[in-house]
Amino acid sequence: ILIMDEPFAALGAQTREIMQAELLRIWRESGKTVLFITHQINEAIYLADRVIVFGARPGKVKEMIKIDLARPRDLSIKRDPKFLQYEDRLWTLIEEEVKKTMIQDQVVHNINN
């Protein structure tokens, strides 16, 4: 298993896409399992077979989504309607969790003040 925790976070957009393609090539050739942690929704969809969304505090798995997009993938997949549907679904899930956290933080702030 190869565990990667936001390895492309500090890269510019073009370099990030080159490295994503390189990771897909390495994965395809090696057959290794890759656990890839990212905050970038489109990166998760592009690279993954499954995307796991964590919930608000305490961190728990909110949902696991199977990404049913053809392989091999190239950057053109990001314009596919199915890709965009996954992106919308993930944004909605994450937005729900952000709102929960904001409400919890506001309640704690109000209690402490």
Identify what each model region corresponds to.
Residues A44-Y46:
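A short, surface-exposed alpha-helical micro-motif characterized by mixed small hydrophobic
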Residues L2-E6:
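Catalytic Walker B motif of ABC-type/P-loop ATPase nucleotide-binding domains
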Residues F54-R89:
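Conserved beta-strand-loop-alpha-helix hinge in the C-terminal portion
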Residues R50:
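Short, glycine/charged-rich "phosphate-handling" switch motifs in NTP-dependent
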Residues G31-I37:
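Conserved H-loop
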Residues L23, Q40-N42:
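The feature captures the ABC ATPase H-loop/switch
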Residues A9-L11:
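ABC ATPase nucleotide-binding domain "signature" loop
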Residues R16-G31:
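Helical segment within the ABC ATPase nucleotide-binding domain
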